[in-house]
């Protein structure tokens, strides 16, 4: 009976599947795609056409055209057919499938759009508000395309896919476009990861590359996570630190979020469920400063946010801060102490921290005009042993409360209690020579672990572990060495230490007045400062003197500056040399032109066969001394003619010639020096020889004397000065130069007025 019922049931189910075929109505197939309907270019995709059993062949269409046909195997009937493509392109793609039985064909499936991404550059996506929302809240996301005239689409990852499309709005002034998507409500039972794409309107299946993902953190109701920083929340710039988040045992992923940021700071996905995640920052910078919270997500949903971790970065400002204890860093129990924090920088606030970071206090800075410093006074008391410890002071500005200055020097506060006081003695006496080493011994019959040595009025306290003696005493020795004393005995060793609270790469130690090159050492960071130690062993008198220490940054920067200065100096030197050479060249050409002009004038004067005239103009002499000079000149020329037997052949200019120069050739004779010429010729004789001279003009003459006797001498009477020179002799008609040069004296007349014959000299 049971077997019969089972057989009838199977027969009924089989007939049910074949009823549509027999009646002529084939069911419409369903088309799906794997891995997703949105894939990047070059991705392998597989289309799955779900159909009925007994299909003879299946067909896949792309954009209405038959793409592929698959013949079915009747021996292994299935209700699915797969079509695989190894490399999809960026063409517009819309797919459908259908199937055919022995007698009929089915209808087409519903269209399936395959979207290909990566055709354009990616847009940018950001959250306009805090990406951390409560369950049921809304968030505004801003998408900016990288291409103009593109439509924007916002998608969310996950099993329930949603998308939003918008045309961007453009600012005509900035020419930037964007679209705002208001998404929600957001629930705490899933992750919300958004991406943005852009596409052209005529190709809606071809998208750009996806934007960077933006994940919204939903504050849930699961157990709150915890957060802590190692080595601490106050850390110096450039050092490494680790932030730990701890939550539920089933947590799959942890999120670290910085308050005020529009994106998730960091994400840590666990390989296996656990309750702790590690976020490492290799080198802390000022951008890491701020407030942080942790979240975790599991299959049950989101956790509550952790408490706030405030990360402070120190060493951002290099202006030093000084900390001191008033009246003394050693305070009796129950007493008060004032910690004085000062700086020359105009910080808005000072903050005092304890080494274990269990104590922090901040005060507004106060300006002191008398010292030109800013200060803050931290009053502590009544003092208890809990207040003892090491303190530091920092300065910062109000607009950046998580960015602090370099720290002050450590200040240790001691609380003197009711225990028995120790004893202090010196075996070397109380009077010492300068530079000697001093050993102070501190001891007590109480079993103390440490002793501290303090100088009255000072700020430095030296600590040392105690030793136990057989007599039951605890004791220790404090040795005050030569360092930092500047008095050293010959043969001893000394160490000079250069240090700075500012960043220094290399320290340079130089001795004043020494010709030796300075010493250089790379700096080392110790006790929150940069320092280098220059050791000298077996010092002698040659090493005595005054030393100075300098700090420098990377030498390559100074090398570049030195090269730049050298190049500029050489360029300036080349330009200066060029200007000097050019000026010298111009002066040489100017001198050559002047010499050529003078030679041309000399050739014209010596080679003229006819009188050569020059327009000197009429010059009148009203000075009696000038008239006397004229008489001497006339007398000198006449004396040359009468005493030395020199014959003058004169050429007078034509009557119409406006120029009054006359050239006279002197027959071969010896020309006497000017001192041998006797001015005894009367004005009447000169006036008789030059009857055509006009009144009111002066006559100047210049005699030229050659060291060697000359055969031919020219004399020109000039109206100004007596010139002397040697002219190049004119060429003969045959082109040959005369055998000897000629010496001439230009005696040019300026047509003086007639001298009365009856005038006495």
From Swiss-Prot:
Stored InterPro entries: Ig-like_dom_sf (IPR036179), Ig-like_fold (IPR013783), Ig-like_Receptors_ImmuneReg (IPR050412), Ig_sub (IPR003599), Ig_sub2 (IPR003598), Immunoglobulin_dom (IPR013151)
MF annotations from Gene Ontology: inhibitory MHC class I receptor activity
Motif ITIM motif 3, chain ranges: 742-747
Membrane topology per record: Single-pass membrane protein
Pfam families per UniProt: ig, Ig_2
Domain Ig-like C2-type as annotated: residue spans: 25-116, 117-219, 223-314, 322-415, 480-559
Gene3D superfamilies for this protein: Immunoglobulins
Localization in the cell: Cell membrane
Transmembrane segments: 561-581
Summary of the tissues where the protein is detected: Detected in spleen, bone marrow, thymus, ovary and lung.
One cellular-component annotation, GO: plasma membrane
Glycosylation site residues: 79, 149, 336, 477, 493
Span of the signal peptide: 1-24
Region spans: Disordered: 589-634, 647-668, 684-761
Disulfide-bonded cysteines: 49-97, 143-196, 245-294, 341-393, 498-549
Protein name, as recorded: Leukocyte immunoglobulin-like receptor subfamily B member 3-like
Organism: Rattus norvegicus (Rat)
Gene encoding the protein: Lilrb3l
């Amino acid at each position: 009976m049971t077997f019969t019922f089972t057989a009838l049931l199977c027969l009924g189910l089989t007939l049910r599947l074949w009823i549509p075929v027999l009646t002529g109505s084939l069911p419409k197939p369903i088309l799906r795609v794997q891995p997703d309907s949105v894939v990047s270019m070059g991705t392998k995709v597989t289309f799955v056409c779900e159909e009925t059993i007994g299909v003879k062949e299946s067909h896949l269409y792309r954009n209405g055209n038959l793409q592929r046909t698959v013949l079915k195997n009747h021996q292994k009937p299935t209700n699915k057919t797969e079509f695989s493509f190894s490399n999809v392109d960026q063409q517009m793609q819309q797919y459908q499938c259908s199937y055919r039985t022995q007698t009929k064909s089915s209808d087409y499936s519903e269209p399936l759009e395959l979207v290909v991404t990566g055709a354009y550059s990616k847009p940018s996506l950001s959250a306009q508000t805090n990406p951390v929302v409560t369950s049921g809240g809304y968030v505004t996301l801003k998408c900016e395309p990288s291409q103009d005239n593109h439509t924007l689409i916002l998608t969310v990852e996950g099993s329930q896919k949603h998308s939003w499309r918008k045309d961007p709005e453009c600012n005509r002034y900035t020419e930037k476009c964007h679209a705002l998507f208001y998404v929600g409500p957001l629930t705490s039972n899933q992750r919300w990861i958004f991406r943005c794409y852009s596409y052209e309107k005529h190709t809606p299946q071809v998208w750009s590359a996806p934007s960077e993902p933006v994940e919204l953190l939903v504050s849930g109701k699961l157990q709150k996570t915890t957060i802590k920083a190692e080595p601490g929340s106050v850390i110096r710039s450039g050092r490494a630190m680790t932030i730990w988040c701890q939550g539920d045992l089933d947590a799959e992923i942890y999120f670290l979020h910085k308050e005020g940021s529009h994106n998730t700071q960091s994400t840590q996905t666990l390989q296996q469920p656990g309750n702790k995640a590690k976020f490492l920052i290799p080198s802390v910078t000022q951008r890491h400063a701020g407030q942080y919270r942790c979240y975790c997500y599991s299959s049950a949903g989101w956790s509550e946010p952790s408490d706030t971790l405030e990360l402070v970065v120190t060493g951002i400002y290099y202006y030093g801060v000084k900390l001191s204890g008033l009246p003394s860093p050693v305070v009796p129990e129950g007493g008060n102490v004032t910690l004085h924090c000062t700086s020359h920088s105009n910080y808005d606030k000072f903050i005092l921290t304890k080494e274990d970071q269990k104590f922090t206090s901040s005060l507004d800075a106060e300006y002191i005009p008398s010292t030109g410093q800013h200060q803050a006074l931290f009053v502590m008391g009544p003092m208890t042993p809990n207040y003892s410890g090491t303190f530091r002071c920092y300065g910062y500005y109000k607009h950046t409360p998580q960015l602090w200055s370099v720290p002050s020097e450590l200040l240790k506060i001691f609380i003197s209690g009711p225990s028995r006081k120790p004893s202090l003695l010196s075996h070397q006496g109380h009077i010492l020579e300068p530079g000697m080493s001093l050993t102070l011994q501190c001891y007590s019959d109480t079993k103390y672990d440490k002793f501290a040595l303090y100088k009255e009025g000072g700020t430095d306290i030296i600590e040392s572990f105690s030793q136990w003696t057989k007599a039951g005493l605890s004791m220790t020795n404090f040795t005050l060495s030569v360092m930092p004393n500047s008095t050293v005995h010959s043969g001893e060793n000394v160490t000079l230490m250069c240090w700075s609270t500012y960043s220094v790469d290399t320290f340079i130690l130089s001795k004043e007045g020494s010709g030796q090159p300075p010493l250089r050492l790379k700096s080392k960071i110790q006790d929150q400062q940069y320092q280098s130690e220059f050791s000298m062993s077996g010092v002698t008198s040659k090493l005595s003197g005054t030393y100075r220490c300098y700090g420098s940054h990377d030498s390559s920067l100074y090398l570049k500056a030195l090269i730049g200065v050298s190049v500029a100096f050489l360029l300036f030197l080349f330009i200066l040399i060029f200007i000097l050479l050019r000026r010298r060249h111009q002066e040489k050409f100017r001198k050559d032109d002047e010499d050529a002009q003078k030679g041309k004038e000399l050739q014209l004067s010596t080679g003229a066969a006819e009188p050569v005239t020059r327009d000197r103009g009429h010059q009148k002499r009203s000075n009696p001394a000038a008239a006397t000079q004229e008489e001497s000149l006339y007398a000198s020329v006449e004396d040359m003619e009468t005493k030395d037997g020199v014959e003058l052949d004169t050429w007078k200019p034509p009557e119409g010639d406006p120029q009054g120069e006359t050239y006279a050739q002197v027959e071969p004779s010896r020309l006497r020096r000017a001192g041998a010429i006797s001015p005894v010729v009367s004005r009447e004789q000169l006036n008789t020889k030059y009857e055509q001279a006009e009144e009111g003009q002066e006559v100047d003459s210049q005699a030229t004397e050659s060291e060697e006797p000359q055969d031919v001498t020219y004399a020109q009477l000039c109206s100004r000065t007596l010139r002397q020179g040697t002219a190049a002799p004119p060429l003969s008609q045959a082109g040959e130069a005369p055998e000897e040069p000629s010496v001439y004296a230009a005696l040019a007349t300026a047509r003086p007025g007639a001298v009365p014959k009856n005038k006495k000299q």
